[in-house]
């Protein structure tokens, strides 16, 4: 069955979508739907099936029914299907980008950039499919000992709303390449691009049941998926609070759980840093995707020798940032993704006004729709290290500025956080930068560069920023399990009967 989802930049409408389960397009079994909202106007786009536990069960069973067949489909065939999917994504990039802009608020130029990168992930894992394997082990005697890396089986992919399509692709690409079957639950606020992606999976020729999409609320469909006893692996990207609940639900049936969670990432400017470059990265750090980025530079640490000059330059640069309609070519920052999240970010801005000094922003941009979820880039200074805006993840275009003079104190302040996802250092002295990087309790450190997600580099957090890694060959561990096989090449009944060395 063929179904086409489309978005139009002028009408801002999309044809009503259906879920994709076992190769078929289906409504929710209950018949229930819910609206998906355009963030730039606050108006409904279309209705989405409101899947529940019964829909999740059908999708998981479909994935389980073909799990063994897919596991033993040769890696070259799996790779060819992923490459065909990459071709289809490239061919449909403009349509995917427009749907992403419409549904999630990404400004169109950025959405295009993200969508055109997705084939890189699919191609990378297509290339890895027939190259990832176990190892041989040297053991005493005339014996052969080796390991196999086997797929987990059915994997659940619970996708966030900030980068819906990219995170979906980076998650399912290794899972499918390594022989797992997938059930995807996109965020309720941003489901349209996942359903368009399902069309392309279908067109690429993946067998029915290998890839499934169930839409619905996290508390209903998402929780049911994480708790399903036939799900052997769970990948979740989102808040630490929700991640804890996903881990609890998955732990009830001992599923392997991979979590990329919250962050309060520092951007550190050293006294010898090239300030123009550092200012540009600081703006990207908390304004990109309207600050709705797990690695957002929401803590800005400025050395006291350059702080005043840096802040002058920062304000000047922020005055050039255009906030507005994602489909307007001049826009550089779009809206927040939902009304609920908009209200949350505005509450944090009010908290910041009580805790610190507002240097820039703090309100709604002018010339934006009244019902859109727009917030100005916002900078607070004179921020105490124990302030809420310095410690809690806001997930909006808000940064807290703190000054520093001692590297030891700087590192202690950065590490005094429940999060440990990411850090950026701007420093010409590479020895000082490397020493600082080694002492930071985070999963990734970029020196004189901004976060650029790539399929070949591992991404993940320390502490309450998550477990496991997405991307890079390190991601293999999130989608496979080890099997050991030992062979005695000179079996002897007498020796076999000797239990002296047998484990107890």
From Swiss-Prot:
Transmembrane segments: none
Active-site residues (renumbered): 260, 294
Signal peptide: none
Keyword check for Oxidoreductase: yes
Keywords: Cytoplasm, NAD, Oxidoreductase
Cellular component aspect of the GO annotation: cytoplasm
Pfam name, any one: Aldedh
Catalytic activity, as annotated: 2-hydroxy-2-methylpropanal + NAD(+) + H2O = 2-hydroxy-2-methylpropanoate + NADH + 2 H(+)
Subcellular location: Cytoplasm
GO MF, one annotated term: oxidoreductase activity, acting on the aldehyde or oxo group of donors, NAD or NADP as acceptor
UniProt EC number: 1.2.1.98
Record bears the keyword Hydrolase: no
Principal subcellular localisation of the protein: cytoplasm
Entry-linked InterPro entries: Ald_DH/histidinol_DH (IPR016161), Ald_DH_C (IPR016163), Ald_DH_CS_GLU (IPR029510), Ald_DH_N (IPR016162), Aldehyde_DH_dom (IPR015590)
Expression triggers: Induced in the presence of MTBE or tert-butyl alcohol (TBA).
Reported function: Involved in the degradation of methyl tert-butyl ether (MTBE). Catalyzes the conversion of hydroxyisobutyraldehyde to hydroxyisobutyric acid (HIBA).
PANTHER family tied to this protein: ALDEHYDE DEHYDROGENASE-RELATED
Family recorded in the similarity comment: Belongs to the aldehyde dehydrogenase family.
Name of the featured protein: Hydroxyisobutyraldehyde dehydrogenase
Organism: Mycolicibacterium austroafricanum
Classification of source organism: Bacteria, Bacillati, Actinomycetota, Actinomycetes, Mycobacteriales
């Amino acid at each position: 069955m063929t179904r086409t989802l489309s978005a139009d930049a002028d009408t801002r409408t999309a044809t009503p979508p259906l879920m994709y389960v076992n190769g078929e397009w289906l409504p929710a079994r209950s018949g229930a739907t819910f609206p998906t909202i355009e963030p730039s106007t606050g108006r409904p786009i279309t209705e989405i099936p409101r899947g529940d536990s019964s829909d999740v069960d059908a999708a998981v069973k479909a994935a389980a029914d073909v799990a063994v067949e897919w596991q033993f489909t040769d890696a070259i065939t799996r790779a060819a299907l992923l490459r065909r999917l990459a071709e289809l994504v490239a061919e449909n990039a403009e349509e995917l980008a427009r749907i992403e802009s419409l549904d999630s608020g990404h400004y169109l130029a950025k959405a295009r950039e993200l969508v055109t990168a997705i084939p890189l992930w699919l191609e990378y894992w297509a290339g890895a499919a027939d190259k990832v394997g176990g190892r041989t082990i040297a053991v005493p005697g005339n014996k052969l000992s080796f390991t196999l890396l086997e797929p987990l089986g059915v994997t659940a992919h619970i996708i966030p709303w900030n980068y819906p399509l990219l995170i979906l692709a980076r998650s399912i690409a290794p899972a499918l390449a390594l022989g797992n079957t997938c059930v995807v639950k996109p965020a309720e606020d941003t489901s349209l691009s996942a359903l368009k992606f399902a069309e392309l999976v279908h067109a690429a020729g993946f067998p029915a049941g290998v890839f499934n999409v169930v839409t619905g609320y996290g508390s209903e469909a998402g929780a049911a998926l994480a708790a399903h006893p036939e799900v052997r692996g769970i990948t979740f990207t989102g808040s630490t609070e929700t991640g804890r609940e996903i881990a609890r639900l998955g732990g009830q049936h001992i599923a392997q759980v991979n979590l990329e969670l919250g962050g309060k990432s520092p951007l550190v400017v050293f006294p010898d840093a090239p300030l123009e470059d550092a200012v540009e990265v600081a703006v990207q750090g908390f304004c990109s995707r309207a600050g709705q980025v797990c690695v957002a530079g929401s803590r800005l640490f400025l050395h006291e020798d350059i702080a005043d000059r840096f802040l002058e330059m920062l304000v000047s640069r922020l005055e050039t940032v255009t906030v507005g309609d994602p489909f307007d070519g001049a826009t550089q920052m779009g809206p927040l993704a939902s009304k609920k999240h908009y209200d949350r970010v505005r509450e944090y801005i009010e908290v910041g006004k009580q805790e610190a000094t507002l240097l820039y922003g703090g309100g709604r941009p002018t010339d934006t729709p009244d019902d859109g979820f727009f917030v100005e880039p916002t900078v607070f200074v004179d921020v105490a290290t124990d302030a809420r805006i310095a410690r809690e993840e806001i997930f909006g275009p808000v940064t807290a500025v703190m000054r520093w003079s001692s590297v030891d104190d700087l590192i202690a302040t950065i590490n005094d956080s429940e999060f440990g996802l990411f850090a950026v250092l701007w420093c010409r002295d590479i020895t000082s930068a490397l020493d600082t990087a080694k002492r930071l309790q985070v999963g990734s450190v970029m020196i004189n560069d901004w976060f650029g997600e790539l399929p070949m580099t591992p991404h993940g957090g320390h502490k309450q920023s998550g477990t496991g890694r997405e991307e890079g060959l390190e991601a293999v561990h999130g989608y496979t399990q080890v099997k050991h096989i030992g062979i005695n090449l000179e079996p002897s009944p007498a020796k076999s009967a000797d239990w002296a060395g047998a484990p107890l």
